[in-house]
């Protein structure tokens, strides 16, 4: 799909990006967290009104800091680019993935269908890290598929764990769980699950673990063991076992979705 069409999709949402205001429940809270981090000189550990805030990894907050440094203030249009650009890149990845098996008109139709779906465009317009994580997950899966289909390059052995780490660094463990389970299920359907270590072997695990170790070291040096324990156990294991954000029974979400 030609690059001009991606600009068309961007132009369609510019009025929303310019005219909308910040939502008080999430967006203003993120800006408050960033202000507190800039004031106190924290870059790996975050606090909200003095309370420890380990709910989200630092990548998105770093982007908010970058935007404030560029614009000199919290500019809605500038901040929104960190959601809408990953959304457009996600569409580009999907188009690239199916390029050999589809026509240009079919890819354009698919792009419009995805771009106008409620959950996708909704995530692309709000100031959240969801679309950023989606982009990195898609990059990881596309890289895996290239390697599986014999079209990969040597650098993909590094890029696959790097993209997975960036997905984790965007929004936490789901950035790890989704691509790993997807790869396993794909290989299971292909009756080739034993080859999993060929695509994600000791080298890939080592690269992923190395990036995580650097991140955790930064947290420990800045926030100590209390913050690190909250991130690794309270926000990960305890939330998986007994979520404190989503308390409905599992069938509620099945019906809702």
State where each predicted segment sits.
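Membrane-integral, polyisoprenol-dependent glycosyltransferases
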Residues: 1-257
